């Protein structure tokens, strides 16, 4: 009997975030999906949790093309069905960002926040997306694309579910955004204390930014950001924007969590290291050394931090001011001599 119970409480699940294509509807990275499916099938989890940004969602369009977005949902759901196991979802800001996309989500997948039990553990699926007011045509403001802190209603859901699952052996939490990134984030004072009181083992998010992967441990809870970037930004963006380079130069990844009784082990699996062709010396040169030897690059190499740049600007400004003052003094002296 004990052996059977121990066997029943040994299971695994995968956590995968930001699998969307784009930009634009209908742009689906099928080659990368095929690799993802192979890796998930190889890991053979009992179920998968998808942590948001699963379709492009006609993001920022003035009027959402409902048929196009629904077609993309059909396409990605067909991919996810190939995992060969149950799939659970939380929304990202591309999935739900105005009234039409919200209606599509709820009609296909039900409530934005859910929980379920598996082998004595409790799993909380949370919504971290901005939502329009009922009947409003408003769209997600740019300042909220990284999510919103959980309001009183969403926190009440967490409290109820944790209270109902106080006997759970483990608690795992999933959401679309990295709401704990900043040290002064409301998450740490409003949500983390609730999770700390339960048997919470890990919290997972799937959004990009500032990295694809990050991890912090606090009070015995692992906070894991794990995501993929199947649509590579143009080379000009990678050359010109440090934030884009930091993302694109991390490997795509997903989490595989193995639970064996009281033991929880989180493994990070990578995607595209060999298959994508993105991590070659030629790619590095194309992004980082395309202007090697140029005057601009030589100047940049001398001032490769903001502090150095500001220091040089101060020196140049001070030099210009002193030079101007000296020229002014000389001209004044000459004019007085002639007077």
Regions found by a protein language model. Give the residues of each.
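Sec-dependent N-terminal signal peptides of Gram-negative exported proteins
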Residues: 1-7, 330
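N-terminal active-site segment of His-dependent metallophosphoesterases
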Residues: 5-67, 160, 181
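Mobile, glycine- and charge-enriched loop segments
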Residues: 9-26, 30, 150, 154-185, ...
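Residue-level marker for buried hydrophobic side chains located in beta-strands
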Residues: 13-15, 48-50, 89, 173, ...
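A mature extracytoplasmic/lumenal domain signature
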Residues: 17-20, 127-130, 177, 227, ...
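Active-site glycine-centered loops adjacent to acidic/histidine catalytic or metal-binding residues
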Residues: 18, 52-53, 92-93, 176, ...
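Extended active-site neighborhood of metal-dependent phosphoesterases/phosphodiesterases
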Residues: 60-170, 190-202, 210-260, 264
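A short C-terminal boundary segment appended to hydrolase-like catalytic domains
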Residues: 245-339
